[in-house]
Amino acid sequence: PAGNGRKYSVNGLDDDGNVDCRLHPLWGHSVALNYGFVFDECNRDAIKPKAFMFAAEGATAAGVAAQVEAAQVESGGFRDGDLATVLAGTNDIIEIYQRFPGESADALTALAAERGAQLARAVNRLVELGAKVIISDVPNVGLTPYALKERALHTDTDRAALLTRLTTAFNQQLGVTILLDGRFIGLVQADLQFRAIAQSPGGYGFVNVTEGACTVALPLCRDDT
């Protein structure tokens, strides 16, 4: 707790109210920290970075493919022992969903499946270039506060169910297209975990799984935060 009796760390803030990325690391940061590595983007202690960030705001499956090629060039090539972490697809699902009802649910489901396969091909490309990969599938977008709001706003169909359908199609093709033989790629089944949490939140220590945690736009983090 801070001197004013408030605890800022739960919001990712230090005692002075400044954003501190170390308090709530992204999962990629946590993986890197497990090996004693830091990213330049979250390096308030000025340690020499040995982990490198190629993620981009709003990236889709197509964007990840471009990021893979950029990482190959900027790193001078992947080497044995290099590990890449990948989580993408939510932006694809939202973009595809927003085409409804102009395009049919069946057509959009097929498109979501193709995007999942596209992301898988980008992951397989990482393996081809020499990296090992940990990839997470997409947590069910149909369980998000956004989905629940969309369901309340529209009466043409269950919009949350449609978002779940798109998520499932994406994840299924991702899972069957990646080179999943136990040697090169580890698949994090985040979707199953999030569905279990939504089904029985109390069992996982959650009280509220329907409302957004952030009611205002998040701050843009600087390299030192």
Label each PLM-derived region with a short phrase.
Residues 1-225:
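Conserved active-site regions of diverse hydrolases
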